[in-house]
Amino acid sequence: MSNHYYTKNPETESKEASWTFPLRGREFRFISDSGVFSKKTVDFGSRLLIETFRLNEEVAGDILDVGCGYGPMGLALAYAYPARLVEMVDVNERAMSLARRNAEANNIRNVKVYES
């Protein structure tokens, strides 16, 4: 059976890496690893969504990041909208752990990470 980034518990050998990346006017520090989506950088599609997302302030409620991976989209939106809770879900246990660690490393508290 092959491993994919949507595998619950990747068997791929862990090879963590960290880097910084600017999103929405802030320099974020990310930790990523083998077995997660776009492990070496924030991919073009995610960057585009992050930079163009605009929240309708008239609509109440939380923000949901489905397939959060190591967290770049959810964390950038949590930073941009600190009054909102960002709920982040993923099937990949390694990715969820990284998302939690990245939230802590970037001092972002208005997020919760769940298994989907």
Regions found by a protein language model. Name each.
Residues 23, 33, 43, 65-69:
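Short glycine/serine/threonine-biased micro-segments
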Residues 26-28:
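Well-ordered beta-strand scaffold positions
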Residues 1-24, 35:
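N-terminal auxiliary segments of SAM/dcSAM-dependent transferases
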Residues 46-116:
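Conserved SAM/SAH cofactor-binding pocket of Class I
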Residues 20, 30, 40, 62-64:
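Short, flexible coil/turn micro-motifs enriched in small/turn-prone residues
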Residues 33-51:
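Conserved SAM-binding loop and adjacent beta-strand
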Residues 3, 31-32, 59:
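Generic, low-specificity signal for short hydrophobic/alpha-helical stretches with a mild N-terminal bias
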Residues 16, 31-32, 113:
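Residue-level signal for pocket-adjacent positions within structured domains
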